[in-house]
Structures are given as C-alpha cells and as structure tokens.
Regions:
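Short histidine-centered catalytic/ligand-binding loop motif
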Residues: 40-43, 75-78, 146-158, 195-198
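Secondary-structure boundary elements
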Residues: 98-101, 128-135, 169-176
Length: 248
C-alpha cells in the first residue's frame, strides 16, 4: 500500500509511473531513468524550494519541511528573504475566499490505477470527491514562454495539462481538473485555471501513445534515448567527434 511516507520510495518509483516521471521521460529518457534508479539527483534550487514551502503550508507539514531543509534559514536562524516572500505569498492566498475554497478539499490524496495496463500513482493536492481535482502551482509569473519556437502558456510548457489528464484518468470519475496558481513576484498574482476537456483528452492520448515505451525502459527491455541537453546528459557526455561551430 502506498502512503505519504513511501510514496517516493525507490521501490514505488520503479513499480509505478507518475505524472512527474512521465513528463521527465518526455524530456529525456536517459535522465528520467537515471533519476529513478538513484544515479542522478536534480538540483534542489531555491525556486523549487519556495514552491515546496507554499505546498507544505497547505499540506500542514511546514514544520517538517523546515526541519528537513535547514538551508532556508540564515546563520542567525531567521528565514532567508526568498522564504519570507513565500510567507507573504501564503498570506496573500489566504486572503482570497475563492482560492481557499478550492484548496479546502482533502489534502494529498493518494490514488493508484492503470493507463494502458501500466500502474500509475497520483497525489492530489486538494480533492473534492465527486466535484473537482485541484493542483497547487507556484511559479515565477503567468507570462507565456517560448518552447520549440512557439510561445505557449506555462500550463503547456511545464506539462500541467499532461498531469491533469493523468490525474483525471486515475481518479476515474472524469472530474474537472483545476490549477490553483500563484506567482513569486514581489506582489503575488493568483488565479484558478481550468483546462478544457478536449485538451485533457488530447494529452491522455499522448500518455497512451508513449507510456508502454517508458515502462519498457524502466524494465530494462529497451535502451533510453539521450537528449544531450539536460544536466544528466551533460554530466555523462563522452566526446566522440569534433563539431563545426555553425552546428552550435
């Protein structure tokens, strides 16, 4: 049985696919596999920790988060500036009645299921049974971003639409998926964002088309493809040829 304590255990990470795993495989198969096997660890950036700080508040695990991440404090024991800003973000969100309503569901609800016969695990930030699935995101801002030559919503760039499709499929009741979002700007912006069902359906088809290959990679049945751009690929790169500067 999966619990909050063993959700990210090596055994469960290998046994189950997750939304974050799937997105990692879409970005770089080799890097995703190395991370699952414990051969590579993503850098714990300040930006990531600020978002996790806000998450921990809503999970009611902030004291534990502080204990596990002493780097968020100065030598004198005060919160560093970035995490004081996280406190301000929380304060701002708590002043908004609608935001709090969507975040008032059951917290960190774990569910398992299958997509294309592949086991998946999900953890829902705020679950309103029979009504909606809500996921909390804290980001730099709400501006569109460039990816592969296209200017896209951050929802598409970070794969939150794919996450929504997976959550909806595993929850099993075709519930609407919403993002409660806040920015890390000096004066935080906030929004409740819906993703249309046709977009979720499109993303679920993407998952179905790729998940068997990713599962076979996890099982060692096929070799992962390297992207040659991520930190893992850079750290394990072996030069085999000389390249022309115009190819850079």
């Amino acid at each position: 049985m999966i619990t909050s304590e063993n959700y990210f255990s090596p055994e469960n990470n290998m046994k189950y696919m997750s939304a974050s795993q799937f997105k990692a495989f879409m970005n770089c198969e080799a890097g995703a596999l190395a991370e699952i096997k414990g051969e590579f660890e993503r850098e714990k950036t300040t930006s990531l920790l600020v978002g996790s700080y806000v998450d921990a508040h809503y999970e009611k695990t902030l004291d534990l988060f502080k204990a596990q991440n002493p780097e968020i404090f100065t030598q004198k024991g005060a919160l560093k500036a970035e995490y004081k800003q996280a406190e301000y973000i929380i304060e701002r969100l708590e002043r908004d009645e609608l935001f709090q309503k969507y975040m008032s569901g059951e917290k960190q609800v774990i569910k398992t299921g299958e997509i294309e016969s592949i086991p998946f695990k999900i953890k829902i930030d705020s679950y309103h049974p029979g009504k909606v699935i809500v996921d909390l995101k804290v980001m730099r801002d709400f501006e569109q971003m460039w990816k592969d030559g296209l200017k896209l919503s951050f929802v598409e760039v970070w794969g939150y639409d794919i996450q929504g499709a997976i959550y909806q499929a595993i929850e099993g009741n075709n519930l609407p998926f919403f993002i409660t979002a806040a920015t890390k700007e000096k004066e935080p912006d906030l929004a409740i964002i819906s993703i249309p069902q046709d977009r979720l359906d499109y993303c679920l088809n993407q998952v179905k088309e790729n998940v068997k290959r990713f599962d076979d990679i996890k099982k060692g049945l096929i070799e992962p493809t390297r992207c040659e751009h991520c930190d893992y690929c850079k750290s394990t790169k072996v030069l085999t040829e000389i390249i022309d500067y115009t190819s850079l």
